[in-house]
Amino acid sequence: MSALRSVAGLLQRWLLPARPAGLYDRQLVVLALALMAVGLVIVASASIPEGIAINNDPFMFVKRHGLFLVMALGISWFVLQVPMARWQHYNGPMLVLAILMLVLVLLVGRSVNGSIRWLPLGPFNLQPAEFGKLALFVYLAGYLVRRQSEVRERFIGFMKPMAVLFVVAILLLAQPDLGSVVVMFVTSLGMLFLAGARLGQFIGLILVGVSAVVTLVIAEPYRMRRVTSFLDPWADPFGSGYQLTQSLMAFGRGSWFGEGLGNSIQKMEYLPEAHTDFVFAILGEELGYAGVLGALFLIFALSFKALKLGHQALVAERLYEGYLAIGIGIWFSFQTFVNVGAASGMMPTKGLTLPLVSYGGSSLIIMMVAVSMLVRIDFELRQASAQARVREVS
């Protein structure tokens, strides 16, 4: 018990340190870079067979992933220079741009596996849904500041952002992309609840949302197959349950400490999407449950610090920054829950990436932009606190 208390104390001191005099929270940066490093290593291992099969180049995907990392870091550096007041001021145009991109992808987008989710930009493919997530949360944080009393006191104030979400959801479902819709819905509900929306409205919308998801699943045979295969994948291990059974076999082979980095069998064309949606299964096979717990701790710590930062911003009466930071924390944690749940058989597959780990340029860049926003929020809070102390002294 004393050892457990020591570990708990160590984690508490690391996750909840006294705010240092530095310019920003270095732990946020370290956590994000650590996740990106884990992703680079696992993508490099998981994508080798796919790269050979497509282009006879075992490092095809890891070279692209490395380029995405460089782009993500470069764009993040630019985002760090942008004051949060700018994001608050331009949240409306940002959402309009996201909606226009979602319309454009339906008109000229690239179809992959029956889904039209990508805009071809030369050698790159842009996924507007990823930008749409961030744009919606940036807009919703601004709305909650502008209409806080209306959200709390009037039903129409609660429903206006839900109407915006409905428009975005219709465009996403036309691709189709139910996974992104679910992430947006859950994150938006969390932000509205923390802004003081009435519990009855909140519960009613949850029931409507669950009913809508059930209807969408029943209406599409491929979604119904995903649900039935999730409930009993071994009933059709070479058909609808194939991907999940292969993923479960990867976790089983990994056991506690894994087969060793690069020694995965399931990535050898057995497990589809091994370097994207199911990269977590390959991580489990090669690094075992120890590696799984390590990766989950990094994501948990990043999400926890985002939520804690949001709380600090709300206490400091910086409402926009507080709502946005909390939204980012909910987004990261829920998307991780869905991705890990799909890979481990706890949830139907949704086609969502593991934050900062899975292969995918759009997801990686947008999530690093979100992390940069968190760092900027922390910087501005520290700056305001330092200025307040100077005024007190003078």
Curated annotation (Swiss-Prot):
It catalyses: [GlcNAc-(1->4)-Mur2Ac(oyl-L-Ala-gamma-D-Glu-L-Lys-D-Ala-D-Ala)](n)-di-trans,octa-cis-undecaprenyl diphosphate + beta-D-GlcNAc-(1->4)-Mur2Ac(oyl-L-Ala-gamma-D-Glu-L-Lys-D-Ala-D-Ala)-di-trans,octa-cis-undecaprenyl diphosphate = [GlcNAc-(1->4)-Mur2Ac(oyl-L-Ala-gamma-D-Glu-L-Lys-D-Ala-D-Ala)](n+1)-di-trans,octa-cis-undecaprenyl diphosphate + di-trans,octa-cis-undecaprenyl diphosphate + H(+). Peptidoglycan polymerase that is essential for cell division. It comes from the Bacteria. It is found in: Cell inner membrane. This is Probable peptidoglycan glycosyltransferase FtsW. Residues 49-64, 110-123, 176, 220-279, 344-354 are periplasmic. It holds the Pfam family FTSW_RODA_SPOVE. Its EC number is 2.4.99.28. The gene is ftsW. It is an enzyme of class 2 (transferase). Belongs to the SEDS family. FtsW subfamily. Its main location: membrane. InterPro entries: Cell_cycle_FtsW-rel_CS, FtsW, FtsW/RodA. Pathway: Cell wall biogenesis; peptidoglycan biosynthesis.
